[in-house]
Amino acid sequence: MDKSESTSAGRNRRRRPRRGSRSAPSSADANFRVLSQQLSRLNKTLAAGRPTINHPTFVGSERCKPGYTFTSITLKPPKIDRGSYYGKRLLLPDSVTEFDKKLVSRIQIRVNPLPKFDSTVWVTVRKVSASSDLSVAAISAMFADGASPVLVYQYAASGVQANNKLLYDLSAMRADIGDMRKYAVLVYSKDDALETDELVLHVDIEHQRIPTSGVLPV
């Protein structure tokens, strides 16, 4: 065998291991794709079971944080004279307040205009002292200090203003369910008197999950 044949044989011998090595990444890629699909299905399953702080007639749905759910309360403001104010403390059901150490992450207010609504209202949520009587003067000062976000909701011909939600983040404050009695929803009727049949406020309190009863009520 001459020198050229020896060189050619040597090259062929060196190629064989490389042919075998090419199949390894292909197998690993297939396994990775299967694992990715399984994780994707798992994420979809977990997301589907997570509560959502939304309402079918409202836009901008928000999924609750993992491990959290929400409790909703409804507030219907009484008549508010033009340029006047209304305040209501957050009072959760007893079935929720008994777990007063569960953390609260966010408070969401959804403004639901009724058919007769034709006004402009300002809405906010504030932490208030236990001694506060939520008088007109006290509420007016809280709107003026700029310490909380304010939602300005105006009449819209479509019936629902594009932005009808206010989201108040309490995560950094480490607030819990027991603290909710220290918070109040405040309303300012700016341009017109707000009648009792014009507006409903839905307040969603996002909090850590609480045990549910396994016994039917008597």
UniProtKB/Swiss-Prot annotation:
Annotated Basic residues bias = 11-21
Q: Which residues carry this modification: N-acetylmethionine?
A: 1
Q: Which UniProt keywords apply?
A: Acetylation, Capsid protein, Ribonucleoprotein, RNA-binding, T=3 icosahedral capsid protein, Viral nucleoprotein, Virion
Keyword check for RNA-binding, yes or no: yes
Q: Which domain of life is it from?
A: Viruses
Record keyword Acetylation present: yes
InterPro entries in the cross-refs: Cucumovirus_coat, Cucumovirus_coat_Asu_sf
How does the entry describe the domains?
Answer: The N-terminal arginine-rich stretch does not seem to be the major RNA-binding region that allows formation of an infectious ribonucleoprotein complex.
Q: Which family does it belong to?
A: Belongs to the cucumovirus capsid protein family.
What exactly does this protein do? Capsid protein. Probably binds RNA and plays a role in packaging.
Q: Give the protein name, as stated in the record.
A: Capsid protein
